[in-house]
């Protein structure tokens, strides 16, 4: 395919147009008075959302150079979402501000490499200051506040807080899943999660979220390595007749077996998801036994003289639902015998009391939390399918925010935390282009507050200047147009979300500014010839 090139200023300006188009579509959603964006869906009803990463993913521009600029900002949103689960709109606003300000300086003759050094230096200081200002999440109310701010809905914050309280939040495990329902409520169901994901992305059932969701699946539990498809074919034939999906938990599924599972999944013959067994060595065997007891399965192992070729469907476990991501597998409401589960829990508690090894005790406590902690299910209801999708997205963001808050604490919300570190960053000693790079970050730190104010119908510059001179923690409440102590009022953001947004925005901005040439494919022209007209008198 023939390529075309642009260099220097031409290249950067073309990409900037793409950055601005995407960022302008996303930033209207930031803050309590942010608006929604309607996304056209080819085969379903339009999706109405204010989720930054969802909007960013939908944007594809006709001009290849503009599209590359948009894709760079998409990467900011995706990375922030991947690490922190929220804050994608903030990251987009920060990236646009840094790119716009940086490009002005490059056009004026600044050296992009020096600017990059200054940006990196300023962001490092800002992140350290954010951690210094961070406060731990200590109670149910603070979790509810984080969820409510993220979802812009106090009711959602309350339900997430209740769900977190039900599963416990001791730092070992917090499992909450979201299901569709006719009303909003939370339930605690028996289940477990382990840190192993699907062995092939072709196994997913939802390509948008890259998740495999299995309803009422059979569960095969084995410590064997499955290489030959023939070894599991008799068992899979029985599963196919039942018209139910299957989760295969094994030492590893590889070669011919993995290939055939993927091919049959793509053809629609059956739905199967293969994941590696959790843990290692003796601990792996114990965790497989935990899973088998929870789901009512029989572990297929040489220790019991069992072979995969002889396995029957009654050796499989079952559960009401299984959700598999690229990193984790969550089993909800296994059909194991309650007495057997209680006996296993008692056994684990006894082992925890008897062991003298701190490491073994920690691992046993993890297993106990997985087995006895349960899975909180938030059931989401709405009046229409469009509203349901939008509400699920908001709850997912809020849930990710609360997890991030538990990990690294909270800071003042509404963009206040970024302006609070302004003074610390400005004290950085630097010269020349490095100093200019620091100033680029300083201006960007005020961008989220500025946009929140503008979305509320106010002059952003006035709000920013007043905030710079306010006491630490005091900020602008965009919902009421009041100046309040953000932490006391419960207007908070997870430190991890704010930090990730700033770091990823700076990373992409630095790459953008140091770009000197852009190579793009030339779109192929449509060479279809027009139809020939008929001869006179011909039909």
Swiss-Prot record:
Gene Ontology CC, one term: cytoplasm
Keyword field: ATP-binding, Chaperone, Cytoplasm, Isomerase, Nucleotide-binding, Stress response
Catalysed transformations (reactions): ATP + H2O + a folded polypeptide = ADP + phosphate + an unfolded polypeptide
Binding annotation for ATP: 29-32, 86-90, 414, 493
One annotated GO molecular function: ATP-dependent protein folding chaperone
InterPro entries according to UniProt: Chaperonin_Cpn60_CS, Cpn60/GroEL, Cpn60/GroEL/TCP-1, GroEL-like_apical_dom_sf, GROEL-like_equatorial_sf, TCP-1-like_intermed_sf
Biological function: Together with its co-chaperonin GroES, plays an essential role in assisting protein folding. The GroEL-GroES system forms a nano-cage that allows encapsulation of the non-native substrate proteins and provides a physical environment optimized to promote and accelerate protein folding.
Family: Belongs to the chaperonin (HSP60) family.
Xref: NCBIfam families: GroEL, PRK00013.1, PRK12849.1, PRK12850.1, PRK12851.1
Subunit structure: Forms a cylinder of 14 subunits composed of two heptameric rings stacked back-to-back. Interacts with the co-chaperonin GroES.
PANTHER family: 60 KDA HEAT SHOCK PROTEIN, MITOCHONDRIAL
Official protein name in the record: Chaperonin GroEL
Organism per entry: Staphylococcus aureus
Lineage: Bacteria, Bacillati, Bacillota, Bacilli, Bacillales
């Amino acid at each position: 395919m023939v390529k075309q090139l642009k260099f220097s200023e031409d290249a950067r300006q073309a990409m900037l147009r793409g950055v601005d188009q995407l960022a302008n579509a996303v930033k209207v959603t930031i803050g309590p008075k942010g608006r929604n964006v309607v996304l056209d869906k080819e085969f379903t009803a339009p999706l109405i959302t204010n989720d930054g990463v969802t909007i960013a993913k939908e944007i594809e521009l006709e001009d290849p150079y503009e599209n590359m600029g948009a894709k760079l900002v998409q990467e900011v949103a995706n990375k922030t979402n991947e690490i922190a689960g929220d804050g994608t709109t903030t990251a987009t606003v920060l990236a646009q501000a840094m790119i716009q300000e940086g490009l002005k300086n490059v056009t004026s003759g600044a050296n992009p490499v020096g600017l990059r050094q200054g940006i990196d230096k300023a962001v490092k200081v800002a992140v350290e200051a954010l951690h210094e200002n961070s406060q731990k999440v200590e109670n149910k109310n603070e979790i509810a506040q984080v969820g409510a701010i993220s979802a812009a809905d106090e009711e959602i914050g309350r339900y997430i807080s209740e769900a977190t309280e039900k599963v416990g939040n001791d730092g070992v495990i917090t499992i909450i899943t979201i299901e569709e329902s006719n009303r909003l409520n939370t339930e605690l169901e028996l289940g477990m999660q382990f840190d192993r994901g699907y062995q092939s992305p072709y196994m997913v059932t939802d390509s948008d979220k890259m998740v495999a969701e299995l309803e009422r699946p059979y569960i095969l539990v084995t410590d064997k390595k499955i290489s030959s498809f023939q070894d599991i074919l008799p068992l899979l034939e029985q599963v196919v007749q039942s018209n139910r999906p299957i989760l295969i938990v094994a030492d590893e599924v590889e070669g011919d077996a993995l290939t055939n599972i993927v091919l049959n999944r793509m053809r629609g013959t059956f739905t199967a998801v293969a994941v590696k067994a959790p843990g290692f060595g003796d601990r792996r065997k114990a965790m497989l036994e935990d899973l088998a007891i929870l789901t009512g399965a029989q572990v297929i192992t040489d220790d019991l003289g069992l072979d995969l070729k002889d396995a029957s469907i009654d050796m499989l476990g079952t559960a009401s639902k299984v959700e598999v991501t690229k990193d984790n597998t969550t089993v909800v409401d296994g059909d194991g015998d309650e007495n057997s589960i209680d006996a296993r829990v008692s056994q684990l508690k006894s082992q925890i009391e008897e062991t003298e090894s701190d490491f073994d005790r920690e691992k046993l406590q993890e297993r106990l939390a997985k087995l006895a902690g349960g899975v909180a299910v938030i059931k989401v209801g709405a009046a229409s399918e469009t509203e349901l999708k939008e509400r699920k997205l908001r709850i997912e963001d809020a849930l990710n925010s609360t997890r991030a808050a538990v990990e690294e604490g909270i800071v003042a919300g509404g963009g206040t935390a970024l302006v609070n570190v302004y003074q610390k960053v400005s004290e950085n000693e630097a010269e020349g282009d490095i100093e200019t790079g620091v100033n680029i970050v300083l201006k960007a730190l005020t961008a989220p507050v500025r946009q929140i104010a503008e979305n509320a119908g106010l002059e952003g510059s006035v709000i920013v200047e007043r905030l710079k001179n306010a006491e630490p923690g005091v900020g602008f409440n965009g919902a009421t147009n009041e100046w309040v102590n953000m932490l006391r009022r419960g207007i908070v953001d997870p430190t991890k979300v704010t930090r990730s947004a700033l770091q990823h925005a700076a990373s992409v901005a630095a790459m953008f500014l140091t770009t000197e040439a852009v190579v793009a494919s030339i779109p192929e022209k449509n060479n279809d010839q027009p139809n020939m007209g008929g001869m006179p008198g011909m039909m």
